[in-house]
Amino acid sequence: MNIFSKLALTAGMSLLLAAGVAQAQSKTFNVWWYELPDTPQAVAWTKALEVFKTKHPDVTVNFEQKTFDQLQKAGSLILNSDQAPDVLEYNKGNATAGLVASQGLLTPLDDEFKKRGWDKVLNETNTQLSKYDANGVYGSGPIIGIPALGEFVSVFYNIDMFQADGLKVPTTLAEFEATLDHFKQKGITPLAYGTVDSNAQHLLYTLALTQADDTWVKNYQGLKAPLDTKPFLFAAQKIADWVSKGYISKDSTGLKGTDAANVFSSGKAPMFVSGTWNNGNFANTIKTFKWSQFIFPTPKYTVGSTGSMFVVPKSAKNKDLAYDFIDLVLSKDNQNEQANLGGVAIGADPAAITDEVGKRNVELFKQISDKGGLGFYPDWPVPGYYELLIQATTGLVNGSTTPDQFVVRLK
């Protein structure tokens, strides 16, 4: 090889190496989630991203804030495109994660689950909603998502308003209704409520679970039998009755869950039935009264589950980086951080939790899960149920749908 050939080869190699370095330096890690910025999990995940940046200084991190509704309505389209991120928060359940898993749009994580020690953080109970069969039904099949938190629906209540009238936390449905009536007699609408989004179904399903046993929950969530509508009929009758008595405002049909949360946090309503994702907001914004939570009185089941999951799209360009990020989210430091911000962390060290809200929520979640009382969510069984339940519940509140018509729509 003559000198000119050697020079040409050397120059060519240099160009290739330079291109490779430039490509490595320009690698972009795309991550999405829909948790509101002030929630404990979002704050903790943001800190995990900062740690990620220090561990991967050659990677550009591109975070995008999404909404729950965006991914609920367009998840399949996004995941089935070249615009999918490397990792994203996704809702669990047959109708959401199950649907896209059955379409082959998610990366199986079983190998990473064991290799990276995630099985030491998450037990079988924590991962039952991470597995979906070929039909998209939860409980078996490959692991396609990793939860990093728990969540449940409870009754947020204004301690000051309760104490001013000598009221105790209700322990039965009858006592709960008596509390509603007490406030209404004082001219106060007792329940903050919104039917425009997922808040519509939380109260509805909570009331249905007052009439549910193990068989009903398993049949409903696992599509094991035709729908027994009796618990939903009871729930629909209660909501219609509570609207007629003024326990729920008819104006709720114009409110989102965040609007209803603002009604509670501003002190206008003494109670709000919603999920633990409100804790960060309430801890930061409620300054004029004391507040807490209690589990709605049911025989066993509470609306809730392990939280939303991080999934890795089949089309993700940087899967190893996605796994590294999940490592950080599941780390003891990040889980403790989440708990001490008031979150329901799955892998936190109880001895390390000093935050009052975080400690309460971890304890309540343990109380529910230890008795096998996680009833999941009503929109999970089949795709399209989310929108159907919102429309049908809105009809109950505005009077355009009777309880009997409501349950007919669910079949």
Locate each region found by the language model.
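Extracytoplasmic/periplasmic substrate-binding proteins
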Residues: 34, 47, 95-98, 202, ...
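Extracytoplasmic/periplasmic solute-binding protein
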Residues: 135-148, 153, 177-224, 240, ...
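Glycine-centered hinge/linker elements that transmit conformational signals in sensory
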Residues: 180-183, 221-252
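Conserved N-terminal structural module of periplasmic/extracytoplasmic solute-binding proteins
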Residues: 12, 24-105, 115-120, 169, ...
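Extracytoplasmic/periplasmic substrate-recognition and gating elements
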Residues: 54-55, 81, 141, 245, ...
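Short, solvent-exposed loop/beta-turn-alpha elements that line the ligand-binding surface or hinge
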Residues: 110-125, 212-234, 283-286, 295-303, ...
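Hinge/lid segment of periplasmic solute-binding proteins
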Residues: 95-152
